[in-house]
């Protein structure tokens, strides 16, 4: 274990040293000394030296405005480098990676050792594997793309430096390159000056595909195939690619007025353009590689006399011409030119697949399997995974927008006001119209801009090549009519196929009603005919936690899934649960393997569909090797969950969860909604007001510009509490509820739940992780610097609650200290705290100065504002999850 850490530690200190030299060259010895002093004080403050903690606070309070930015940047950049070293560590032979691709092998061995599972059953489970990762542009991806590229290169240098056999001159060359990269990062502004547009966000997503997934996915499939051959003597069929990528960037318009129908149309074209670009590079390689002459009669018939001399090349060159023509047409469309579609325009995956697969079959038949299974196989798998659209997109819109559009329409038609009808009347109207052959939208109707936007979006979906849009997600879905309304709007737009429409249930009440809503829908004959035995439902993690606290929300999510699984099973419907998880614990984030095994039995039968949030995309898919490791983890977890499902919880456990849920929700809402001091305390003790100024994502932080906590999006709500280290949304209410159940004499039952029920043990594990990242002395310091004295008692009360909560969680989990079973994560948090603490202290100081200036009617000092932005980004890097 310790060897593992020492490799990580030595890389971290080496990168820190290079950063120090860079700072000295850029700003002189005195700034470096300042930074070093602060680092040493922080280290001994962490070790429990109170005098040094006091000195740390004084030193940071007394920095001049000129010193603020360099000090903030030094610690922030250091944390980015530490994260890079840790990311490398997770794939390095000395680090975690020694164990990750092995996940699949370990899972297969575990499954083979179960007497009740035949090899055939395991094969069938592999064949029905389905993993769809939905990339979302979260404003929380704070790091700029420019810096991400540099960090990828730093990673490559670390990898080469690990090679024991490199010559001295190579070692010196690599160190020089590292110095250059770290200097480039230091002299680059880490904060974006402008908010990214939705198109910028989509380009960020394409960059992830190009830099990592394009190579990572075929590598993962080779790894999977190797393990299956070794353990089951089973070869993956060429056409079997269980992983797909979808994106919300450019498709998610919920609360984001910047994502319009035109933007979605543009992103769809851009995505296809990027796909032609990447496939052209692949085909170029194949043109030079596939110079073979021998071919099957089928292939020769396909190429005719003209191509007989070099049949494979001939087909590849043809495909290359089609790709080039397609790319040129897409480029013209992106510039706004209207051109007729060229001969051979590629719109469907089959058009890419057929010539490539014909070559593959011919090479195999002619004894050239070794060639067929090289680059050609990788390209075939990319066609299955990415294809013509590159990534498909989801459209997401809030339910009320559809209701308002239909209300405006029915008023215009003089048949009443749809918005004020009862649910039964709405359903009757919708089903009648869905069954009708005549159009509903009048020709000369001029709807309002909002309604026009909803109709235009449906038009874009109807015109897009089939297969480029994956699903229509309805946020804040509450009733069956919410789902039927979207089907009607799509029908009116002339859509020619059954588009999956997924209701998203995201508040406590909506989760509790989810099963009723779906049961009603499945009882409608027209609806059953439309969906052809398949239904997708999305479970919202972040909004339900913000609404009711984590304990109540996670139990509601579990119960909703459990009920939906049983209802769909009874109705013979294949259910795909779509999980809207975030990177942070308050938004449902948990280590993948634990999270999947803690879901109700049967929840992964229809495959896994899950959102991957901005900042987590980089940690999980930032490099091809990490992609292989993340996909392997998911694969192992899905196989295990489907073949060895977790137990059904005992009735007594369910009753305890009901009780925990009620107590924790009451306490959580008692503070967040009913305590009149809470909102003023939240606004002053966290950088919530200042966060709005950060040019992070393309969507506004609030659903409505005025309003309290409930109008704040889930992301800034959690982000703000992560910054001041109280981490409140991720624990408030949970420990108090546990304590109450312990006092009722049920501790041994809770211990049994922790031991034998993955759902419950994952809950507790996530609480431990949050407590390990929280820091009460820092939260208290924010209060002293920023909060009105009258509100101090509330802060004290919340901190005392957290201390009590930690005790009860440790007692139930039977641990002496936090994260006892995950020492690697505990180590990583400790390593970063030394650098995150000064940023927290500095942030409190900067907020104090900035608010003081505002109070006195002065413009805030730009140096203070800039340094504040840097601390926000730095703490996010230190906490490894933002919102």
Swiss-Prot record:
The keyword Transferase does not apply. Its cofactor is Mg(2+). Its EC number is 4.1.1.31. Pfam families: PEPcase. Keywords: Carbon dioxide fixation, Lyase, Magnesium. GO terms for biological process: carbon fixation; oxaloacetate metabolic process; tricarboxylic acid cycle. It comes from the Bacteria. GO terms for cellular component: cytosol. It catalyses: oxaloacetate + phosphate = phosphoenolpyruvate + hydrogencarbonate. Belongs to the PEPCase type 1 family. Forms oxaloacetate, a four-carbon dicarboxylic acid source for the tricarboxylic acid cycle. This is Phosphoenolpyruvate carboxylase. It comes from Escherichia coli (strain SMS-3-5 / SECEC). The gene is ppc.
